[in-house]
Amino acid sequence: MTEQRFNHKISRRTFLKVCAAAAAAGLTACGKTQAAAALPELTVGSDNYPPFVYLSNDSTPTGIDVDIATEAFARMGYAVRFEIIDWEQKTKLVESGAIDCIWSCFSMDGREQLYRWVGPYMVSRQVVAVNADSGIETLADLAGKTMMVQSTTKPEEIFLGGTDPRIPQFGELLSAEDRSVQYAMLNCGYVDAIAAHEAAILRYMQDCNANFRILEEPLLVTGIGVAFALNDTRGLDEKLTETFAAMRADGTMKQIVGKYLPDPEKYLEVDALEP
């Protein structure tokens, strides 16, 4: 099995700014208001990954994870800034303190001991997509085919690991640092299939009118979470866990997910995930 890496680095080291510093107002003795100090800011390391994190038409960062993070951290007394990072360097960045956490549809499966996790807060299916007219119907049909994935993702780990008996021998496995490359390669017929989070593929199909078909059998059904460094002792993970519980209870999670995905309840059924 051959792996080829396409070094299409995202040159746009765009810094996504969310939630400018907020000011609280308090009444003075004279009945006038007085602005309080700006909220402390947390930096979230992320990938450009619609519908979880992306730029809207007016260049405002938006998406499921942006909205959840903004609301959750505001309840905790923080502002938040999303920074697009080199995804392959995410662990080094969070451990060094360059970012406060990793938050971008980040699968927890197999990484449980690598970080301080908050979650899972959503369920995600890792799936394989092909062109609609492809003869590939099952995972077994991928034998001898050319597959493309984003580097350092769960699909790449699954395919390179060789431990899933459902996965046949590919003709070639390609990895790209920029996830958008795999969509273009499939659209043009340069690869036979791609693998990624189902919600991300569906969003691309909607936005770009792509005629893809998702195989019925998923590669993996997993929980996604927020990752803090193991050496982070500030207690942010514990406070965020409590805040998530409150947001689930008051319906905020469902409301946010429903803005971007149909049938939001199925994405929030984290209790049904296998331990």
State the predicted function of each range.
Residues 70, 79-141, 218:
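Acidic, polar ligand-binding/catalytic clefts
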Residues 89-92, 105-114, 158-161, 185-221:
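A ligand-binding cleft/hinge motif common to bilobed small-molecule-binding domains
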Residues 55, 69-78, 155-176, 205-209:
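Ligand-binding cleft/hinge of the Venus flytrap
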Residues 66, 82-92, 173-184, 188, ...:
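Short helix-initiation/N-cap motifs at beta->coil->alpha
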Residues 66-75, 136, 140-146, 151-154, ...:
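Extended ligand-binding regions for polar small-molecule ligands
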Residues 38-105, 250:
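Extracytoplasmic small-molecule ligand-binding "clamshell" domains
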Residues 47, 123-130, 206-244, 263-275:
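Periplasmic-binding protein-like
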Residues 1-10, 18-28:
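N-terminal secretory signal peptides
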